[in-house]
């Protein structure tokens, strides 16, 4: 790992104290200045957001997320991948399930290649490669300046190795999940161990102008992050990562059982809801397959 300088990022607004967990979470309000590093110049003049198809998880088991099958309209998960193109550079947010799954029957492809019982399994369906979708809009892996994951779970890091030349933007907690002393080796992102890496703290302004901000929303993982993109025409959006899995999470305030007791996910959701109210941003849940099917996909884009 080539470690770049560590930024201490000034968080927006107040700090909420999680007394039960002894942790701090920053509440986000627009208006403060963030540290950011110099970026390369891209060919576009404005900000663009491309939505790519990173595959589908076929599942009928929302109980793991605190919901029943009767409560969820569509239990399958889309695995969205996002390319943000800014005049100062490019950022890829999440990388999908993995191009290696293209052409494999979904009923023979359990999530994470784990042979789980069919009644509770998630199965993988990938019909197009992320690489080909990027090439269709003129971007090879070598043209991606920065890489960030909402978190390093299998459905978000499947193509990570293809972007090892990019600078990895990550919090220490998630980096330790990937490469720390107790980490389980995962070949899907093994190449990132030698990538340029920026350990970020709190919220992070990627390009230095407030238009693309990684929001620290821990809980699902220690370093989980969501992404704010201030689109001039479409309006601002927040890409949720796995802070929410289903749209019903919003309606019923549900979450995985393991995330309830510490209170960290709850605090991150409160932080994000305050941020949405302040900015008027739309919330995009990357696993919401019904919403994903209605979105514009690359080569179309939001700006």
Annotate each language-model stretch with its function.
Residues 9, 13, 17-18, 31-155, 162, 167, 187-196, 202-207, 211-218, ...:
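Metallo-beta-lactamase
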Residues 108-117, 250-257, 302-303:
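Short glycine/proline- and charge-enriched loop/turn segments
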Residues 158-164, 294-297:
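Metal-dependent catalytic neighborhoods of phosphoester/phosphodiester hydrolases
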Residues 22-30:
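Hydrophobic membrane-insertion alpha-helices, especially the h-region
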Residues 94, 151, 220:
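Conserved G/P- and acidic residue-centered "switch" motifs that form tight phosphate/ATP-binding loops
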């Amino acid at each position: 790992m080539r470690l770049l300088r560590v930024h201490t990022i000034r968080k927006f607004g107040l700090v909420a104290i999680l007394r039960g967990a002894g942790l701090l979470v920053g509440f986000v309000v627009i208006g403060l200045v963030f540290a950011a590093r110099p970026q390369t110049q891209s060919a576009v003049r404005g900000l663009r957001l491309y939505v790519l198809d990173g595959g589908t998880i076929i599942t009928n088991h929302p109980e793991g997320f605190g919901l029943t099958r009767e409560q969820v309209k569509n239990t399958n998960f889309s695995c969205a991948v996002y390319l943000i193109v800014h005049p100062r550079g490019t950022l890829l947010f999440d990388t999908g399930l993995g191009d290696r799954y293209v052409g494999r029957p979904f009923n023979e492809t359990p999530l994470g290649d784990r042979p789980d019982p069919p009644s509770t399994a998630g199965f993988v369906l990938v019909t197009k490669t992320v690489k080909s979708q990027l090439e269709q809009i003129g971007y090879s892996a070598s043209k991606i300046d920065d890489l960030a994951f909402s978190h390093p779970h299998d459905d978000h890091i499947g193509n990570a190795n293809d972007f090892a030349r990019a600078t990895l933007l990550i919090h220490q907690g998630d980096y330790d999940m990937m490469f720390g002393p107790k980490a389980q080796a995962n070949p899907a992102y093994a190449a990132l161990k030698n990538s340029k890496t920026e350990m970020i703290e709190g919220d992070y302004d990627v390009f230095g102008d407030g238009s693309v901000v990684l929001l620290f929303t821990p809980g699902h993982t220690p370093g989980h992050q969501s992404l704010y993109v201030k689109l001039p025409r479409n309006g601002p959006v927040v890409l949720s990562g796995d802070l929410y899995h289903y749209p019903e999470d919003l309606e019923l305030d549900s979450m995985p059982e393991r995330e309830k007791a510490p209170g960290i996910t709850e605090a991150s959701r409160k932080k994000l809801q305050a941020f949405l109210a302040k900015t008027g941003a739309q919330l995009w849940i990357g696993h919401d397959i019904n919403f994903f099917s209605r979105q514009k996909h690359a080569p179309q884009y939001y700006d």
